[in-house]
Amino acid sequence: ILIDHHPYPDDFANFTISDTSVSSTAELVFEFILSLNSINEIDKNIAECLYAGILTDTGNFSYNSSNPRTFEIAAELLKKKINKDHIFKNIYDNYALSRWKLLGYCLYEKRNILHEFKVGYISISKQELEDFDFVPGDTEGFVNYPLSVKGIVVSALFIEKNDIIKISFRSKGEYAVNELAKQYFNGGGHKNAAGGE
């Protein structure tokens, strides 16, 4: 079984549930459970996982969340007595000081804004990651910072890892970064959030 909300899911499963209009795979999992008339099987632990999936894929409900159904599902999960503030804190307020220092370094030294192209990007070398005691997850969300600059509609984050450069793309509006990632960087993703290498 494959449950995915990304465009062009892999074709390896006997049964696929795919819908790119939903906020997250967690939302699809909820709907799948609901379709089996098994809503009562969602206990607090499952509800916490589904809520965390929706929370992270929507950037705390700041994107991929214009469908009222996303909020209806979140409300159903809250009825399971989950602690949404605890979930938020564990995801977004749980970073090491080294991550904060790396972010400051990237925003001050490594950011590039190309106003004429409406593009901003950050690049980080393997050595720089080591210098800041990088652990997986430390660069989560860095790609979004250039989009906060007025007039910027596309952002990218380039991270050197061993023999490859990992790339994350974000965009606003009609700029389809998933097509860029697919065509040039062996990647893919959503229209406004994609990656490649």
Language-model segments: what does each one mean?
Residues I1:
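N-terminal small/polar loop signature for handling phosphorylated ligands or for N-terminal nucleophile
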Residues H5-I73:
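Short alpha-helices
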Residues L55-Y184, G189-E197:
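Hydrophobic helix-and-loop "lid/oligomerization" segment in the mid-to-C-terminal part
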